[in-house]
Amino acid sequence: MAGTDREKALDAALAQIERQFGKGAVMRMGERSKEPIEVIPTASTALDVALGVGGIPRGRVVEIYGPESSGKTTLTLHAVANAQKAGGSVAFIDAEHALDPEYAKKLGVDTDALILSQPDNGEQALEIVDMLVRSGALDLIVIDSVAALVPRAEIEGEMGDSHVGLQARLMSQALRKITSALNQSKTTAIFINQLREKIGVMFGSPETTTGGRALKFYASVRIDIRRIETLKDGTEAVGNRTRCKVVKNKVAPPFKQAEFDILYGQGISREGGLIDMGVEHGFIRKSGAWYTYEGDQLGQGKENARNFLKDNPDLANEVEKKIKEKLGVGVKPEDLTAEPGADAAGAAADAEAPAKSVPAPAAKSAKGSKAAAAKS
């Protein structure tokens, strides 16, 4: 009897909360619709897999940080382009005043539709972010970068003035305000951040990010991006090999890594990543310098195979779909089509296995080699 009275009292409290704060203000978790997490894909299949859900989650705070020229803005611009291709609206808060529109166009960004703001100080930037997020009309908002969100007092003060903790307090207040609005409007906020070094650290890494600790706590995903190798065509540098580590992940298991190529003037090489993962998971066969897919030759050398996939986007999409289906990432359950005789246990084991780092690519093949045509 006591249990029944308690249940009635709880139901009455829930009803009162809904009347006062609106429907959905409180509910039992079993009553929530079980929908897959909506994502914005990156240009790297390996990173989508490492994130565990097929891309950057919607309605969350995401932090991307790393050393200078490591690919932070490039990775973010690819996410911007993919959000726009899906019909979304995107805003870019360029606090560094360094966005190159021509480079953004090369990565697929629709610069005519991109909402751009170049604020004068940190308070203005975060106030603009808050107003845009609360409009509910954005799919993605990018803040580049946290280090450039300089408080108004610091800008208006003298060069030698001390402003300890101002930026950290500014970030903490802003994140408290916008986090709930981001979730309700399904808007993703990507904060690009820089690295600094703590003085006097004897043990452990001295590296830290700017803006205090608030962003570390509020971020659902934190990605550490590093340049690990220079890609060369003979003696000419043509790009970088980049490694991303998911150091925090609230939507999937963390600490997974992904490697991909960033080519100068082109951005992330999606096709190069598909070749690496296709070979790793057995969809693309590598025999000597030749790459083949289901008996069709893609080309001699990775560069020719990459160009072949770039010229045949349907084939590239097919390879990507098979990789994601095998790993159970970024594919709706109803879209999965199990092949006869497939080893379900093996597929499940592959889905649970952490994403392995792809070894650095070999040097480009001789320029005289040509990609073979696919079978008609």
Swiss-Prot record:
It is found in: Cytoplasm. Keywords: ATP-binding, Cytoplasm, DNA damage, DNA recombination, DNA repair, DNA-binding, Nucleotide-binding, SOS response. The gene is recA. Residues 338-376 have a biased composition (Low complexity). It comes from the Bacteria. InterPro entries: AAA+_ATPase, DNA_recomb/repair_RecA, DNA_recomb/repair_RecA_CS, P-loop_NTPase, RecA-like_C, RecA-like_N, RecA_ATP-bd, RecA_C_sf. GO terms for cellular component: cytosol. One of its GO terms (molecular function) is ATP binding. Pfam families: RecA, RecA_C. SUPFAM superfamilies: P-loop containing nucleoside triphosphate hydrolases, RecA protein, C-terminal domain. Belongs to the RecA family. GO terms for biological process: DNA recombination; DNA repair; SOS response. ATP binds at G66, P67, E68, S69, S70, G71, K72, T73. This is Protein RecA. Can catalyze the hydrolysis of ATP in the presence of single-stranded DNA, the ATP-dependent uptake of single-stranded DNA by duplex DNA, and the ATP-dependent hybridization of homologous single-stranded DNAs. It interacts with LexA causing its activation and leading to its autocatalytic cleavage. Residues 329-376 are annotated as: Disordered. Its main location: cytoplasm.
